[in-house]
Amino acid sequence: MGTLDPSVCGGLPPEVCEQLMMDQQELIKIKLEKRKWGREVTIIEGLNLDNERLKKVAKQLKSKLATGGTVKNGRIELQGDHRDRVKKLLEEMGYPPENIVIVG
């Protein structure tokens, strides 16, 4: 993975330290919720970003998916079922595929 800072790992072997670092990375969950009158909403949570950066990511996703959406309570809500396409777009934005999980 590259050189690791010894102060971060203490006396742990490099392999163990790398695994611990990977486990601490954000886990992005993409799920579908049904709202009243059967409307579907794609929810993206687990992006550890401040509110402004979260809004920028939401704006990019809404533009590429041609849909409406919002940012509420630290998560992105998009109108419609876009789970597979959102995963692909997040990967294109640089998020590691192993950290993106489609729930349900």
Curated annotation (Swiss-Prot):
It comes from the Archaea. It holds the Pfam family SUI1. Gene3D superfamilies: SUI1-like domain (3.30.780.10). This is Protein translation factor SUI1 homolog. GO terms for biological process: formation of translation preinitiation complex; regulation of translation; translation reinitiation. Belongs to the SUI1 family. GO terms for molecular function: mRNA binding; translation initiation factor activity. It comes from Ignicoccus hospitalis (strain KIN4/I / DSM 18386 / JCM 14125). Keywords: Protein biosynthesis, Translation regulation. InterPro entries: DENR/SUI1_TIF (IPR050318), SUI1 (IPR001950), SUI1_arc (IPR022851), SUI1_arc_bac (IPR005872), SUI1_dom_sf (IPR036877). Disulfide bonds: none annotated. The lineage of its organism: Archaea, Thermoproteota, Thermoprotei, Desulfurococcales, Desulfurococcaceae. SUPFAM superfamilies: eIF1-like (SSF55159).
